[in-house]
Amino acid sequence: MDQKIKSNKIYKKKNQIKKMFDRLSVNYDMMNTLFTLGIDKIWRKKLVNKLFIYKPKKILDIATGTADLAIEIVKIKPKKIIGIDISKKMISVGNKKIKKLKYERIIELREGDCEKIPFENNSFDAVTVSFGVRNFENLNKCLIEILRVLKKGGILLILETSIPKSRIIFFCYDLYLKTIYPLLYNLFSKNKNAYKYLRNSSLVFPNGKKFNNILMKNGFINVNNKPLTFGATSLYFGKKP
């Protein structure tokens, strides 16, 4: 009975997140640019530059959203990029961008959940996630699934928000989240609950060494992270043995 209640709660929260991103899909790209002052593009380029070192041919982009990262990855000329996301409307926006750029042969978007990735074992050379890990309902289950679909020696690269270590930088970061962020958000969205969720999830996510430890406990090796923009974001790396 307890397990059934737990499963129902997980489904309910996941469904709420799905609906939230469906509602945000129309203005999502513009909101990202405004909220990060355009720095999100630099962060994605950092991930792609790291990815290029390993020259992966087949890549899975989880929580692909509107496909910003998948589109950036095209620059390193992989054979195939498959993006999955639980939000149909985010995927719809992404597909329009892909069609406009004529990337249909390289990028394929599908509706999919990281807790049950719809691919066989050892399918991908690399898996990427850009600002989606903190939305995973069952983080450990998703990481186990990622490890499963990676080929031996395949890599995982994750971009995620983190907490600046410097007190001064954290003060500025927290002030921004409490003042400027909600003002910008209210201009483009009437969903206050979405703002609260996105802000709070950024603050409570187990970043830095804590997240490194989670990756290692789930079977990844050579795990490390690199803070970006004074620690407001981190780039995580892990490898399948």
Model-flagged regions — what are they?
Residues 28, 127-128:
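Hydrophobic beta-strand segment of the Class I
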Residues 58-116:
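Class I SAM-dependent methyltransferase SAM/SAH-binding core
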Residues 140-152:
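A short glycine-rich, Lys/Arg-flanked "PGG" loop and its adjoining helix->strand segment in the class I
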Residues 1-18:
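N-terminal auxiliary segments of SAM/dcSAM-dependent transferases
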Residues 16, 159, 163-214, 218, ...:
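C-terminal alpha-helical "lid/dimerization" subdomain adjacent to the S-adenosyl-L-methionine
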Residues 37-57, 72:
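Conserved alpha-helix/loop element of class I SAM-dependent methyltransferases that forms part
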Residues 212, 218-241:
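Core SAM-dependent methyltransferase catalytic element
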Residues 115-126:
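A short acidic, Gly/Pro-enriched loop at the edge of an enzyme's catalytic core
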